Amino acid sequence: MADSQIQNFNHLKIHSQFSICEGAIKIDDLKEISKEKKIRSLALCDTSNLCGALEFAEKISKVGTQPIIGTQINFKLDDTIGLLPLFALNEIGYKRIIELSSLSYLNNDGTSDPHLNFEEL
């Protein structure tokens, strides 16, 4: 992919080292890639947590890349669990994602991964 194509591409589901067993890239590495490729925006979308959100936002914005904060929540419908990416548009959205992420752990009976059901969304 040419550099100009990379610059215009917005990756919306990056999993960092905070997505255990799913992502391995470190925030510092994302920062360097963003700077080198002049990427306009990136979305951090770790699974069931926002542990890297502050570090990501601070470091990525320093190299001129717009950080997009999100998470990937396990969503249960009947007996099926799927993945639902959620992104914050602003501070209110960020706080709501924090609430939903916490709720996915608090209401979990321990027999499955943290998840939300339709009513909780």
Predicted regions and their residues:
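Phosphodiester-processing cores and adjacent nucleic acid-binding clamps
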Residues: 1-121
